[in-house]
């Protein structure tokens, strides 16, 4: 994953674990499981997701919604709750020794899949420590997370936000879905039974990044166990890389791809190396029945503040536990503005409102914005352009050009009544390199409520006609509202193109946010330069008169006599 990730990967894998909850004497009742973060090995302290505890709450999940409740004592759950924590080898427990003790795929679920122990499986299987019993110290939440969640998601009934660990069409009871929604933002602090002294290193396992120290666009590493306690030999501490896409106080979003079971897993920074930034609150987010490709996080620092406060109140005689919780990383600056976009080029993204329609845009000159035709479709229409950086401003503008609906290039140009002071003008790229890291900045998902989001990926394809680029494809997550936003090179910061659309399967209705299309800036730059210098729209008008091969590309059609069948 690159040299910069080495230290973070080691910390993540040392801190990752899986937590299982079951009922005493009821093995047939099944179990609940999630991922967790080892905060301290001696004594053993683990922070995990609170959703697995809702079946055990004496008063039901309604206890999690009481106003002013930031924590619940461990005895809020029934006496038949049994907890176990499992992790991989520690530094004092080499993989070789564990491999000798636990031959092959050691969990029953893996054996039931037909993965029999043997030399090949032993080489691939992950050595594990035996599950250890644990005690629930308290359930805790971050009030600020819940407040921001209610503001951003609570009243959005029309868009039907969906956070359960399944697709919207899957069979999930209303009661189960309500329990999962109530448990969002709730976590649990556990004390793990002590193991062999030789394996225990006293003190915190991780350091914690202060709230606001990681800015939008910063690289993140998520570590969790897909499907929880199922087959940890294979899935324990699976890594996923992404960036901090957006932030509202302690409520964070990342485009790192996480699966059900990774709830409670840790999310770590590349710089400072291995600092714990957040825990996974919901690995799958759906909006209007479409997967948005983002993971919901809760910042770790405020959670640990609640944990210290709660331990002092619930366990006055256990002050040593509070002391052993990880401290914030003092080398990280505090109090960075939460709306800081990080990379300076990202500030060129703006929100464009045209009547009841809104989308994204990019500043290409102090008084010139480019967006999509379907965002601002009528020439001479007045639009309102919002910029979030360096400060929130709104400036009126007029659509001076919009391509015709028959044009394959979905483009509109807005002339502003005033200059957008302080907004950097991006450098247009002259060349494109397939495979290079790229970023999309746009107002999809939240619109103006939370500022622009940043998603990362690679330039997966450059489609050319007669040797000239006419379409760019990326693996960045692109959502409704991102249309018209900029596509940047993550390395150079150069403007590569204008986001036009993601992909939708008309047969199934499924949307694929990680397959999307952008208009290369090289198609637009000569005409934009001509208009900016002379006011002449002639170059832009040429976008309405493209060749048939370009139209074929943007219709996503091939000039074949027979459409090839999929072999899948």
UniProtKB/Swiss-Prot annotation:
Pfam families: Trypsin_2 (PF13365)
Keyword terms, alphabetized: Hydrolase, Peroxisome, Protease, Serine protease
Main enzyme class: hydrolase
Serine protease: annotated span: 332-568
GO biological process, one term: protein processing
EC number: 3.4.21.-
Disulfide partners: none
GO terms for cellular component: peroxisomal matrix; peroxisome
Site residues by UniProt (Cleavage): 110-111
Recorded GO MF terms: protease binding; serine-type endopeptidase activity
Keyword presence, Ribosomal protein: no
SUPFAM superfamilies noted in UniProt: Trypsin-like serine proteases
Regulation: Inhibited by N-ethylmaleimide (NEM). Not affected by leupeptin or trans-epoxysuccinyl-l-leucylamido-(4-gianidino) butane (E64).
Transmembrane domains' residue ranges: none
Induction (free text): By the proliferator-activated receptor alpha agonist bezafibrate.
Active site per UniProt: 374, 410, 483
InterPro entries referenced in this protein's UniProt entry, alphabetically: Pept_S1A_Tysnd1, Peptidase_S1_PA, Peptidase_S1_PA_chymotrypsin, TYSND1/DEG15
Subcellular localization, as worded in the UniProt entry: Peroxisome
Modifications the protein undergoes after translation, according to the UniProt entry: Self-cleavage gives rise to an N-terminal 10-kDa fragment and C-terminal 49-kDa fragment upon import into the peroxisomes. The full-lengh TYSND1 is the active the proteolytic processing of PTS1- and PTS2-proteins and in self-cleavage, and intermolecular self-cleavage of TYSND1 down-regulates its protease activity.
Subunit comment: Homodimer. Forms a heterodimer with the C-terminal cleavage product (49 kDa form). Forms a heterodimer with the N-terminal cleavage product (10 kDa form). Interacts with PEX5. Interacts with LONP2.
General function of this protein: Peroxisomal protease that mediates both the removal of the leader peptide from proteins containing a PTS2 target sequence and processes several PTS1-containing proteins. Catalyzes the processing of PTS1-proteins involved in the peroxisomal beta-oxidation of fatty acids.
Family from the record: Belongs to the peptidase S1B family.
Name of the molecule in the record: Peroxisomal leader peptide-processing protease
């Amino acid at each position: 994953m690159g040299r910069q990730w080495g230290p973070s990967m080691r910390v993540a894998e040392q801190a990752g674990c899986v937590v299982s909850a079951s009922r005493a004497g009821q093995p047939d009742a099944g179990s609940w499981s999630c991922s967790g973060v080892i905060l301290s090995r001696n004594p053993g302290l683990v922070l995990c997701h609170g959703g697995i505890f809702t079946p055990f709450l004496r008063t039901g999940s309604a206890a999690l919604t009481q106003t002013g409740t930031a924590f619940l004592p461990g005895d809020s759950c029934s006496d038949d709750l049994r907890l176990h924590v499992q992790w991989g080898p520690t530094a004092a427990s080499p993989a070789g020794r564990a491999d000798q003790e636990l031959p092959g795929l050691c969990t029953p679920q893996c054996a039931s899949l037909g993965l029999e122990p043997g030399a090949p499986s032993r080489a691939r299987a992950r050595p594990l420590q035996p599950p250890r019993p644990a005690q629930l110290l308290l359930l805790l939440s971050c009030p600020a997370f819940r407040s921001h969640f209610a503001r951003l998601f609570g009243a959005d009934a029309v868009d039907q936000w969906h956070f359960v660990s399944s697709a919207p069409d899957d069979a999930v009871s209303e009661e189960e879905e309500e329990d999962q929604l109530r448990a969002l933002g709730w976590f649990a602090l556990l004390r793990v039974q002590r193991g062999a002294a030789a394996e225990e290193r006293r003190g915190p396992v991780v350091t914690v990044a202060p709230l606001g120290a990681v800015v939008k666009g910063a690289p993140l590493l998520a570590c969790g166990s897909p499907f929880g306690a199922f087959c940890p030999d294979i899935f324990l501490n699976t890594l996923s890389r992404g960036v901090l896409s957006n932030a509202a106080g302690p409520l964070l979003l990342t485009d790192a791809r996480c699966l059900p079971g990774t709830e409670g897993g840790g999310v770590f920074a590349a710089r400072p190396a291995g600092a714990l930034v957040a825990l996974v609150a919901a690995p799958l987010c759906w909006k209007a029945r479409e997967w948005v490709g983002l993971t919901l996080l809760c910042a770790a620092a405020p959670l640990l503040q609640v944990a210290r406060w709660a331990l002092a109140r619930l366990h006055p005689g256990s002050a040593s536990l509070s002391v052993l919780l990880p401290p914030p990383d003092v080398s990280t600056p505090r109090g960075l503005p939460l709306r800081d976009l990080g990379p300076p080029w990202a500030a060129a993204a703006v929100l464009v409102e045209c009547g009841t329609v809104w989308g994204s845009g990019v500043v290409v000159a102090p008084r010139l914005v480019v967006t999509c035709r379907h965002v601002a479709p009528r020439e001479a229409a007045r639009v309102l352009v919002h910029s979030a950086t360096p400060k929130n401003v709104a400036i009126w503008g007029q659509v001076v050009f919009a391509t015709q609906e028959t044009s394959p290039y979905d483009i509109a140009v807005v002339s502003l009544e005033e200059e957008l002071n302080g907004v950097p003008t991006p450098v247009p790229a002259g060349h494109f390199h397939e495979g290079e890291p790229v970023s999309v900045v746009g107002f999809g998902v939240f619109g103006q409520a939370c500022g622009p989001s940043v998603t990362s990926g690679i330039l997966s394809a450059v489609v050319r006609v007669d040797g000239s680029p006419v379409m760019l494809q990326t693996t960045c997550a692109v959502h409704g509202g991102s249309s018209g936003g900029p596509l940047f090179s993550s390395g150079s910061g150069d403007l590569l193109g204008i986001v036009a659309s993601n992909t939708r399967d008309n047969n199934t209705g499924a949307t694929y946010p990680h397959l999307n299309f952008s208009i290369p800036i090289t198609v637009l730059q000569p005409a934009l330069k001509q208009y900016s210098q002379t006011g002449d729209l002639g170059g832009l008008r040429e976008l309405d008169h493209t060749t048939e091969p370009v139209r074929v590309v943007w219709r996503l059609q091939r000039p074949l006599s027979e459409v090839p069948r999929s072999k899948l």
